Amino acid sequence: DVYKRQIQVEFYELLSLGFLLPENVQTIFVHHELRYIRNEKEITLFREQTAGDRMLFHIAKDFERSALLKYKDVIVLTEVDRKIMEDFIGRKDHIYTSPAVVQVGDRLEQPFVPVQSGRLTFVGSEDHFPNLDAVAWFCHEVIPHLRKRHFSFTLQVIGKWRGECINRLQSEYPELKLAGYVEDLGSFLKGSVAVVPIRIGSGMRMKILDAVLSKVPFVTTAKGVEGIDFKDGEDCLIVDDPAGFAEAVIALSSNPQLQR
């Protein structure tokens, strides 16, 4: 009997189910990414904002708020998102934090592997727009600085990407290589510097958790590491500007002590 059960819904695409679920059922929504936060940043990247763009942003924001209020409980992945959520929906009760998890297996027991010369990796599929933005930003903004420093490297992109998108970037940035799906992500990442140039979104970046578990050094942005209590220069390198990001990549690639 569904009325005696707890119903858990996850991901923004299914958020509207809250309008359909019975009132006398315990309902939980797990919000992996606050969509209006992502949209708020995306719209600032438009070459030109129209009144229609702003109207659609506010419509989507109002929908997200009203749909979330239909659930008895809401779970977010970070304390940062929990505080934002409290202000967003106007209540502090029934909002909980539950960090993302990754499969550990035997990765913690595996040895650290020093970075191979100039090998960079990025984990994420194109269908999640913040990943596409991250790779495009790295190519257009960071790679020119790496080239100026005569830094020889390859960037291996792991995940599902359309051929035409990668081909378009590769025509200008041949350092970019599509690795696609890899069966053993932890082993594949070893010996690389992971780059996480995320500028958009909320929640917790699984790619950072994977890098940590695989004992892989990484460079990220403040947005990329948001919600995770990592310190710049101790746990990773955190840089937001393209030139600084390039310098951090070079430093990690060439300094075995810093890699640890």
Where are these regions (language model features)?
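Short, small-residue-biased leader/transition segments that mark boundaries at the very start
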Residues: 2-3
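Acceptor-binding helix/loop patch of EC 2.4 sugar-transfer enzymes
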Residues: 25-65, 125
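Donor nucleotide-sugar binding/catalytic pocket of nucleotide-sugar-dependent glycosyltransferases
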Residues: 26, 54-61, 65-107
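Acidic donor-binding loop of glycosyltransferase active sites
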Residues: 72, 175, 189-203, 214-217
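Conserved catalytic-core segment of nucleotide-activated headgroup transferases in glycan assembly
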Residues: 87, 97-190
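Short hydrophobic beta-strand element within catalytic cores of glycosyltransferases
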Residues: 207-211, 217-221
